[in-house]
Structure formats: C-alpha cells, structure tokens
C-alpha cells in the first residue's frame, strides 16, 4: 500500500514539494539523514517560533530552525521557501528569517520568497492583506539589498523574489544570469524569464 501525506518528506525529495516539517519527529529526521534524502524543500515562512506557530496554526511549528540545523550538520542539501504575508513575516521579520537561514548556507541552496495567495474560500479564517504594487516594490528592494550582501559574503545571491512580485510591482524581471541556474524555479523564481 502506498501511503503519502501532503507534508510527507518523500514528496519533497521525489517531487520537489515543500514541506513544513511540523509533523516530523526526531526519528523521521534521523531517517532522512541515514538514507541521505536530499534535497529537502522546506516551507519555512519564519524562524520566529511564535510567529511560525501563529502562521501555520500549529503548536509544533516553532522548532523549524533546530530541524534545519540538524539537516545542515548532517550535510543534507535543502532549499527554503518563505510565503510572505504583509503585516506578518515581511520587512524586519523577513530580514530576521533570511539572516537566520544564512547560517546554513553551506547546505541551503536558495531561499525563494513568494507572495501569499488568497482564495475566496476564507470563511472563519483570519483576514490577510495581499501585496500590491508599492509593497511589492518595497519587498523587491529589500531582497536586492540582501542579495548584494550575500554576493559579497557567499559569492551568490542566496535569496530570490518570485516573478509574481515583479509582475505586481510592474518592474522588469532580473537579468538571466541573476537567477544563478534557476534553482528555485518551482517557486516561480525565473519561470517567466525562461519563456523570454
């Protein structure tokens, strides 16, 4: 019998899905390390434990950084995703999360920042703002400043804004070489550029 749940690490390895790791116990991480399951695609959203618990509405969500550290220390390759929500994990919280994740740049290939998507199915859910032209431009500027820092520190940009931010901001996409091999393309980073 095949048994795969939505947040199953096998989907991350086999199909490129991003997982929150909220349901992973130490034994699950031990297994990933033992079998060298790599790369692992992680939906981080925030390294602030209280904020991550709130955003994911899951009391087990706060220890993401310790899990990332374990994988990094074992040499497991990872990619990170931050679904950015205005008023929650943007601005200073985004800066904090990216800087926290930069400690694991040895095995963390890239961080993709994508805007939150809102559907009409929001009954009994918290009201969320979405990115507009101005807030998208502000976020792109913030990411470009971080990229400049990481280029000088690591020799690579490390963090990328998804193409959707550029569309919302009504700005041209970055140059082809700025995507550095298009590693976070599953997150919509460089997808439009590939068709130019």
Predicted features, each with a name:
Residues 1-107, 118-146:
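Conserved Radical SAM active-site core
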Residues 102-104, 112, 117-196:
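Auxiliary Fe-S-binding modules of radical SAM enzymes
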